[in-house]
Amino acid sequence: MATATEQWVLVEMVQALYEAPAYHLILEGILILWIIRLLFSKTYKLQERSDLTVKEKEELIEEWQPEPLVPLVPKDHPALNYNIVSGPPSHKIVVNGKECINFASFNFLGLLDNPRVKAAALASLKKYGVGTCGPRGFYGTFDVHLDLEDRLAKFMKTEEAIIYSYGFATIASAIPAYSKRGDIVFVDRAACFAIQKGLQASRSDIKLFKHNDMADLERLLKEQEIEDQKNPRKARVTRRFIVVEGLYMNTGTICPLPELVKLKYKYKARIFLEESLSFGVLGEHGRGVTEHYGINIDDIDLISANMENALASIGGFCCGRSFVIDHQRLSGQGYCFSASLPPLLAAAAIEALNIMEENPGIFAVLKEKCRQIHKALQGISGLKVVGEPLSPAFHLQLEESTGSREQDVRLLQEIVDQCMNRSIALTQARYLEKEEKCLPPPSIRVVVTVEQTEEELDRAASTIKEVAQAVLL
């Protein structure tokens, strides 16, 4: 039976072959021959290679132009034409041999040259030496580090705090410690560069919302909620974070924290709050934007700030619940792999905290001086003030751009240079232009401290007005 079936199939194949069009048979034959050739032929023939002559080699070598190892940098780049500071950059600063009133350094509370802070650092230097020469997990944890963490936690009224040896690395390490690939981060377009680097290291999905625009943020949260409903299994393992600054470095504006907290609970997200500018500035006791708004600090999942502004030291810290902070001790890259904070700087930060707690009126003084110069700088022809009246760091931008960023930078630098000639030290806000996610416009940054007198604030404002009129009109 099987033999008869096989014969019948063979007969059908022969009949189909006879009935097939001639062009079809020819095409199949060519393809079969081509496959056989590919199987048995060599990939190349040695005799087909032709060596270059000596003349051809010399011509190729002469024509070859190597790619530069680094990008071309103009000779007038700020990094190649820096100002040299002599002495501490406190109330008065000596720049290129000229003494100026300092409106450039983030020494908000005037503690950089404070005798008590220097004495504490000197005593620590004599006791511990200069540095630690090791990360916290490898004999780099000193008792003064634990004391500082305890003091910061108590000052901020949180369960625990952790310190880093470099301010920039604090938020840049904290974000990727929690947010991983597949997680979603909603971040303000005006976020500072340290936040951007933390987001990049996290490899999470980044969704940018318009600066301080809660309607735009809620739109993105709603869109994500709809996506989560389409794939509930994925949504269960996807974490959602909202990353904002208390006072924005790039704009000098304050975040609308009460609205952010409402959105957090409505859409089940976590809030990371970067307070490098608002810590030691906002609030009755300098605890930052949470105290300023009267928000329960437990509503914020993680708070970070550097100690290089108000505390006039080095490094940064994160604070929050114990289980949140403990995770960073195992996953915070800047904590695990960098040498710990030099003990003398930790001692200086502790003494700075002591001064802040003993003199809570200092924060009201700072706010009043911020309002004074903010008001005095209004109405400058050609310049506009960008930032809150209560922010100690704000920006002066051109009212109308020339259409060229390079030309805008040159005009603003001319204003900075002429102000320095009149003993007012200012600086432009600098950015890594090719790496910024949302590059801010060129601006002059003005920094206010408690050490500046009312007369000096008025003098700075009048100087900036006169110079701006001379340069821009």
Curated annotation (Swiss-Prot):
**Which of UniProt's keywords are assigned here?**
Acyltransferase, Endoplasmic reticulum, Lipid metabolism, Membrane, Phosphoprotein, Pyridoxal phosphate, Sphingolipid metabolism, Transferase, Transmembrane, Transmembrane helix
Q: List where the protein spans the membrane.
A: 16-36
What regulates this protein's activity?
A: SPT complex catalytic activity is negatively regulated by ORMDL proteins, including ORMDL3, in the presence of ceramides. This mechanism allows to maintain ceramide levels at sufficient concentrations for the production of complex sphingolipids, but which prevents the accumulation of ceramides to levels that trigger apoptosis.
InterPro entries, sorted: Aminotransferase_I/II_large, AON_synthase_class-II, PyrdxlP-dep_Trfase, PyrdxlP-dep_Trfase_major, PyrdxlP-dep_Trfase_small
Q: Which GO terms describe its cellular component?
A: endoplasmic reticulum membrane; serine palmitoyltransferase complex
What is the catalytic activity of this protein? L-serine + hexadecanoyl-CoA + H(+) = 3-oxosphinganine + CO2 + CoA; octadecanoyl-CoA + L-serine + H(+) = 3-oxoeicosasphinganine + CO2 + CoA; tetradecanoyl-CoA + L-serine + H(+) = 3-oxohexadecasphinganine + CO2 + CoA; dodecanoyl-CoA + L-serine + H(+) = 3-oxotetradecasphinganine + CO2 + CoA
Q: Does the keyword Cytoplasm feature in the UniProt annotation? A: no
GO biological process terms, alphabetically, are:
ceramide biosynthetic process; positive regulation of lipophagy; regulation of fat cell apoptotic process; sphingolipid metabolic process; sphingosine biosynthetic process
Q: Where in the cell is it found?
A: Endoplasmic reticulum membrane
Q: Example GO molecular function term?
A: serine C-palmitoyltransferase activity
Tell me the pathway: Lipid metabolism; sphingolipid metabolism
Q: What does this protein do?
A: Component of the serine palmitoyltransferase multisubunit enzyme (SPT) that catalyzes the initial and rate-limiting step in sphingolipid biosynthesis by condensing L-serine and activated acyl-CoA (most commonly palmitoyl-CoA) to form long-chain bases. The SPT complex is also composed of SPTLC2 or SPTLC3 and SPTSSA or SPTSSB. Within this complex, the heterodimer with SPTLC2 or SPTLC3 forms the catalytic core. The composition of the serine palmitoyltransferase (SPT) complex determines the substrate preference.
* Protein's name according to its UniProt entry: Serine palmitoyltransferase 1
Source species: Pongo abelii
